[in-house]
Amino acid sequence: MLTLVLNCGSSSVKFALLDLSANLTLLSGLAERLGSTGAVATLSRGENRRSVPVPDGSYAGAFEVVRAELGALGVREQVRAVGHRVVHGGERFSAPALIDAKVMAAIRACVPLAPLHNPANIAGIEAAQEAFGQLPHVAVFDTAFHQTMPDVAFRYAVPESWYAQHGVRRYGFHGTSHAYVAAEAARMLGMPLDALNLVTAHLGNGCSVAAVQGGRSIDTSMGLTPLEGLIMGTRSGDVDPGLHEFMARQAGLSLTQVTAALNKESGLSGLSGGLGSDMRELEAAAGRGHTGARLAVAAFVYRLAKGVAGMAVALGHLDALVFTGGIGENSATIRAATLERLGVLGFRLDQQANAQAVRGQPGLISAAGSVPALVVNTNEELSIARQTRQVLAAQTGDQA
């Protein structure tokens, strides 16, 4: 069974074609700058990579490129389903869902909760249904994994009517990644997932930690939106809610302007004085003595360690810490500094193992006798493909 996985953003589409029976990715790619005349798709088959223009710079044009590539591979008729990443499923979805009119209506109803993401997801689904209309389409939600959080973790201390009438609560994100790496960590540790208490740290341009108890999320750092929690590439993470009114009064900024700044001009970029959000560049600049870069890296580690410790409190007992995402998988510096701060929880670093766990090399990075810390490569496309297959198997009884 070949499964096409799509992740539609406001100006991009990330795609992958997976053969689950052979555990292979046959095709992957990224269509960028959609909505402009310079839209281009980068296609990768193994080590071969090439770029092609996207007709009219639209989702439909991007999917025409994908269809053509499937034809060139001779596998168009073997594709059995399309799996879509959808950022926000609200309280409605605690599992992936076969997309029909009711599911689409429910995704639309979540737009106020994710105005930066769900509209693009919806537009991408609609264009994909036009391009691949004969295939079943499945929505896999970033928020679904965290629907097992107890109310003490997901409720905000705000008027009850805000929750009852408007759904104001903590939802969490990166759920597909947290669930995948938790299962992989259990496999690598040689222990059953349902017997483990894990903290998973997804560290990329967006960052979050989660407390995973027996394979179920019981807390996470992101909240109503992906803005809450850790310091991220351009997102602030936790700030005083009074900041909006303060900046409106002091600088004449609107709510929209403050929110945009917190999402796009803050985090590592803001702390470094606008140097950038790429951790590799910030680490290098910090090594050269750049004051802003040093502050950004140190604050990132400090807030990450506090986040991990908070998740450990939720678990009561911590069996292992998992690093994943672009930073988590590749920055030995960030991992080492974080574990040094977490010595109070029993972590000790194996410096050689940590140095080797880069560029796609997963493994244990903690010293003997330490609480285990390990690097696990996330694979959200594979997870979405597997969940898509599970939905179809439940619908048809087909285990292929």
Swiss-Prot record:
Its cofactor is Mg(2+); Mn(2+). InterPro entries: Ac/propionate_kinase (IPR004372), Aliphatic_acid_kin_short-chain (IPR000890), Aliphatic_acid_kinase_CS (IPR023865), ATPase_NBD (IPR043129). It catalyses: acetate + ATP = acetyl phosphate + ADP. GO terms for molecular function: acetate kinase activity; ATP binding; magnesium ion binding. It is found in: Cytoplasm. Pathway: Metabolic intermediate biosynthesis; acetyl-CoA biosynthesis; acetyl-CoA from acetate: step 1/2. One of its GO terms (biological process) is acetyl-CoA biosynthetic process. Keywords: ATP-binding, Cytoplasm, Kinase, Magnesium, Metal-binding, Nucleotide-binding, Transferase. ATP binds at K14, H202, L203, G204, N205, G206, D278, M279, R280, G326, I327, G328, E329, N330. The keyword DNA-binding does not apply. Pfam families: Acetate_kinase. GO terms for cellular component: cytosol. Mg(2+). Can also accept Mn(2+). The active site is at D142. It is an enzyme of class 2 (transferase). Mg(2+) binds at N7, E380. Substrate binds at R85. The record marks H174, R235 as: Transition state stabilizer. Gene3D superfamilies: 3.30.420.40. PROSITE patterns: ACETATE_KINASE_1 (PS01075), ACETATE_KINASE_2 (PS01076). Its EC number is 2.7.2.1. Belongs to the acetokinase family. Homodimer. Catalyzes the formation of acetyl phosphate from acetate and ATP. Can also catalyze the reverse reaction. This is Acetate kinase. The lineage of its organism: Bacteria, Thermotogati, Deinococcota, Deinococci, Deinococcales.
